[in-house]
Each structure stands twice: as structure tokens, then as C-alpha cells.
Amino acid sequence: MAEQEGPDKPPLNEQPVAPSASQDDATVETAEEAVEPPEADINELCRDMFSKMALYLTGELTTTSEDYKLLENMNKLTSLKYMEMKDIAGNISRNLKDLNKKYASLQPYLEQINQIEEQVASLENAAYKLDAYSKRLEAKFKKLEKR
């Protein structure tokens, strides 16, 4: 049973024919023309890209430089504040040492005041006892006088 070869079907032993070289070149040329702009446009686009990239990088570097300058100024101000705080702490320390010296020089007088206070309390206690004794004596005297 042999198959019939028809106008639609190629014979079984024949392979399909590839397009000719002239057909292939026409297709490639069309693709290249559609994708690739003229060389003058490419050069202009490259210059434009490089100038914009240069502007961008210059801006980035300027921003970074300004950030570092800001940090430097902040560090200087912080350093000045710490110097002021150091001076204030030094003044407080000196004043505290002076107060401690004055307190040490007043210490004997404070001890004398404490001793005098104790003596006054003792004398006051003795005066109350003497007052109580004198009242008892007076009461005895009045009692004896009534007899």
C-alpha cells in the first residue's frame, strides 16, 4: 500500500528546503535597522548619559561631603559642651573642697556647741530637781508652821 503523493504533501524521501541566503539576509537587515539607531544619535545619547551620570555622582559626593562637614561641626560643638561641663565640674569640685576645709575648721567649735548643749540640758535638769526640792521644802515648812 503505497501512499499517494499529493500537491500538498512533499514526497517522503525529500526534505523541506531551507530559505535561501538572500531571504535570510533581508530578514536580518530589517531587524538591524529597526533596533540600531544611527551612530550620531548613539554618540549624543552617550554624551547625555555621561553628563547626567556626572551630575548625579557630583551631587552624591557633595551630599556626602556636606554630611561629613555637618558631623564634624556636631563633634566640635559636642566637644565644646563637654569642655564647659568639665570646667563646671572642676569648679564644683574646688568649691566642695573649700566647703570641706571650712567644715573641718569649724568642727572643734561644733563639738564645743554640742558639749555646751549637753551641759545646758544637765543644768536644766538640775534646776528642775532643785525647784521640785524647794517646793517640797516649802510644803514641809508650811505644814510645820500650821502646827
Curated annotation (Swiss-Prot):
Top-level taxon in the UniProt lineage: Eukaryota
Gene: bloc1s2
Bias-annotated ranges (Acidic residues): 26-41
Function: Component of the BLOC-1 complex, a complex that is required for normal biogenesis of lysosome-related organelles (LRO), such as platelet dense granules and melanosomes. May also play a role in intracellular vesicle trafficking. As part of a BORC-like complex may play a role in lysosomes movement and localization at the cell periphery. Associated with the cytosolic face of lysosomes, this complex may couple lysosomes to microtubule plus-end-directed kinesin motor.
Quaternary structure annotation from Swiss-Prot or TrEMBL: Component of the biogenesis of lysosome-related organelles complex 1 (BLOC-1).
Locations listed in the record: Cytoplasm, Cytoskeleton, Microtubule organizing center, Centrosome; Lysosome membrane
GO cellular component, as recorded: axon cytoplasm; BORC complex; centrosome; lysosomal membrane
Name of the protein in its database record: Biogenesis of lysosome-related organelles complex 1 subunit 2
Keywords for this protein: Coiled coil, Cytoplasm, Cytoskeleton, Lysosome, Membrane
InterPro entries according to UniProt: BLOC1_su2
Region of interest called Disordered, as start-end residue ranges on this chain: 1-41
Coiled coil: 84-132
